[in-house]
C-alpha cells in the first residue's frame, strides 16, 4: 500500500457552508489558485446543482486550475450528477463526488427509505457518474453511525459499480479515534474488493477529534483525508488541512506518510482564506494562529534563544512565517531583553542591563506587552510611562448620517502649551476622525489592523479598539476605550501618534549615540 496520503480540500464547498455571506466567483478563484500553489491533490469547489451561482463558480474554477484535480459534489440523483459533469467538463482533470446517507437515523428519518433502496440509489449514482469520468468518489454520509454490516455491504457494491474512491465521513463528529480507526480496519478486513479503491475520510470536529480521527484512519489504511483550510466548516468545522499536513510531515519518523502539500504556502493560504471568508483565526490555533510560534514565558524564551528546538517542534519558517516571536512581558528574563537589544543594534556597553531590566519589568506590569519602541525609550529616557501624552485628545465632534458627508472636528492639546482645532471629512465618521488626526500631526500613518471588542456587558459596556499601524516601515500599536466607538477609535489612533512621537525622540538619541561612537 502506498505511503502517499491524498489531500482533498473542501474549503470552497464544505468550508463555505459556514460563512454568513457567500464568496464571489473572483474570491473563490483566488482561494482556488492559493490551494493549487499549496499543492492539494483534489479541491472540491462547490455543489453545482445547488444554485446557478455555484454552478458558474465551479465551471470557472474548473477551466482555470491546471495542477489539482477539481471536484464537484452531487447527491445520488441523475440530475445532480449531470449538473456536476456540465460544470466540470472543461477541467484538465476532474472528479464527480456523489453521496447518500447510510446511517439508520438518516435512512429512516431523513430519507424515509429502506437501506436496500438507499443501496440501489448509491449503485445507480456511481454507474451514472462513470458515464462521464473514470474518477468517481462515493460517500456514505454519516458512516460513523452506520451499522458496520450495512457499511461493508454498500462499500463493496459501490466499488463493484465503479467508484474509485470511497469516502467514510464522520458527518457529525461523533466517533473517537480508536472507534473510527476500528471502522476503517474492519472495512479492510471484510470488504473483499477494497483494494480496488482509495479509502477516504471526512471528519467533522463536533467533539474536537476530527484531526485525530483522520490520522488514526490513515494508520488503519485510509489514503485520502478530506479537510479545509483553518478547519472551516459547518457547526464546529472540519478536519484542519494545515494540522494534518504538518502532523504527517513533523511525525513522518513515526507515521511514515507523505503528502504533496508545500508547507511554505500554509501561512499565506491560511491568511487569505481568513480574510476573504471574514473568519478570524483564533490566536492559539495550531500551526497558523498568531501565538503558534510566540513565546511569553521567560523560561521558554530563554530556552528558544539557546536552541530553537527546546520549545518548537517545527520552525515558523517551515510553514511560511518569517520568524518566531518572543513577546516582551513581565515574565521575560534578562537574557531575552539583552537579546532584543542586540537585535535592535545596541551593544551591551550602550546601556546598564540591570537598570533597563528593572524599568522594563515595572512598565510590563503596567502595560502588559512591551514593544521595541518602549524598550528603546526606557534605555534613553529611563522613564516608565505606559501612556505617553504628547498628543492629548480634548474633544471630538462628528456629524454623519444618510446622505451626509461625515465630518469630524477635533480639539487637541500638543506638548505643554499648544492647542489645535481641526476639521476633516472622510468616508464615514471613523475615517473622518483619522483624516483630521493626520492633518493635526502631519504624519503619514497606514492602518494595518483594526479590531473592536466589548469590555463588559450591557449598555455601559466599553468599546475597546486595538490598532496596528505602520509609520516609516515600523509597526506601532494603539488602544482606545470608551462607551462611544468613534471616541475609542480616535483615542486608539492618538495612542499610535504618541508612540510615534516617542519613537522619533528615540531615533534622535540613537543617532547621537552612533555619532559619538564614530568620533
Curated annotation (Swiss-Prot):
Q: Which Pfam families does its entry note?
A: HCS_D2 (PF22617), HMGL-like (PF00682), LeuA_dimer (PF08502)
EC class of this enzyme? transferase
The Gene Ontology terms for molecular function here are: 2-isopropylmalate synthase activity; acetyl-CoA C-acetyltransferase activity; manganese ion binding
Q: Hey, which pathway is this one from?
A: Amino-acid biosynthesis; L-leucine biosynthesis; L-leucine from 3-methyl-2-oxobutanoate: step 1/4
Q: Where does Mn(2+) bind?
A: 14, 202, 204, 238
The record lists the catalysed reaction(s) as: 3-methyl-2-oxobutanoate + acetyl-CoA + H2O = (2S)-2-isopropylmalate + CoA + H(+)
UniProt keyword Cell cycle present: no
> Which SUPFAM superfamilies did the record assign?
2-isopropylmalate synthase LeuA, allosteric (dimerisation) domain (SSF110921), Aldolase (SSF51569)
**Swiss-Prot/TrEMBL keywords:** Amino-acid biosynthesis, Branched-chain amino acid biosynthesis, Cytoplasm, Leucine biosynthesis, Manganese, Metal-binding, Transferase
**Which purpose does this protein serve, as stated in its record?**
Catalyzes the condensation of the acetyl group of acetyl-CoA with 3-methyl-2-oxobutanoate (2-ketoisovalerate) to form 3-carboxy-3-hydroxy-4-methylpentanoate (2-isopropylmalate).
Q: Which family does it belong to?
A: Belongs to the alpha-IPM synthase/homocitrate synthase family. LeuA type 1 subfamily.
UniProt protein name: 2-isopropylmalate synthase
In its UniProt entry, the species of origin is given as Psychromonas ingrahamii (strain DSM 17664 / CCUG 51855 / 37)
Name of the encoding gene: leuA
